[in-house]
Amino acid sequence: MPGPSQGTTIARVMCMKSVAAPARDVVHGYVSPGFGPVREAFAENFAEHRELGGACCVYHRGKKVVDLWGGVRNKQSEPWEQDTMVVVHSATKGLSAMTLAVAHSRGWLDYEERIATYWPEFAQKGKDRITVRQLLAHQAGLFALEEPVDRRVIADLDRLAVVLARQTPAWEPGTRQAYHALTLGFYEGELLRRIDPRHRSLGQFFQEEIASRLGEDVYLRLPDEIPNSRLATLSPPTPLRMLTGFPLRATVEFLNRRSNIYRALVINPGSSVYIDEERVYARNLEVPSGCGVGTARGIAHAYGVFAAGGRELELRQQTLDLLAAPAIPPTRGFYDECMKGDGVQFSLGFMKSTPAWPFGSARSFGSPGAGGAMGFADPDAGIGYGYVTSQMGTELTGDPRDVALRDALYSALQL
């Protein structure tokens, strides 16, 4: 498939009128020949799916074949530019998992090893037998923190490590799955600090060993020098859309202060900890399960490397084969004690494609984010995909804008 330098179709598609996007908004960017359906789906999202502003990028077998952006990036209706970045919430989890995959390829980490081998203090409170694989599959029973944790604790990695080490699993590790909405990244971060010879934070490692190597704008620790003018602000769904869009059971769980998902996502520290009213997003703070900020281009490029052999990041084939392998269930099955369903499966820090929520081939791995963001690698098709948006949707999985783009992509590939 030819890349953009070998014959690019420039997309200057006027968006149709809609509530979310004024008619003057333009979709910018390009698609390589044969990928026109993706451009059309991106434009239609503004008219059909209340898109406000966003971007979509696709790498195919190492070549960038789709790079689109459009709409507006804030309530002042300033345009979404080529280099606009936005927080991607839990799509960050896939980026964090990439850091551990790089560490695995370097021989620093064994997914089957007990975490306490690398981090001895972790062994207390019945955590001595938890393996790296179990943690990354949300099977460690550590989905919530039992003591107050705020931005000050998160910013002090040594202090945070002490808090993490003294947590008690909610049940016997390896028996159940429960979405570690925010805690997963904290545990990953300390694990990486223990195995990295330079003891870098997860955000620093990602920046130096992945984002900078690829020349892309994606951050797990947003630096001070990034101006607000490069950042898109999130537009939440209306109260009516939230009431009608979220599954009733999920709404009830989110409102119940004793529920697992409330404890995992709403408090201690809560998903709003990385939002800053004056600076859009908190700077120099790492919440590796949710505070990633970047472009669709950066996300797609990183996944594209994982989908096409990993040469740029010196990934071993053994690592890539493990990421593509099926998820291993806990002893009680894939029913998730936080999300109250069994349609989602995790493996080695990534979400896996399942019949209940498919993306790409069965060997694909990636991570969606609250509101609609998505990134994944499909090693069978050689696809690295990234989609980001400022208009938050209400679907827990399978945002219709993302689905429309992926359907158009695989239609273009005739897969």
What are these regions (language model features)?
Residues 5-8:
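Low-acidity, Ser/Thr- and Arg-rich intrinsically disordered low-complexity segments
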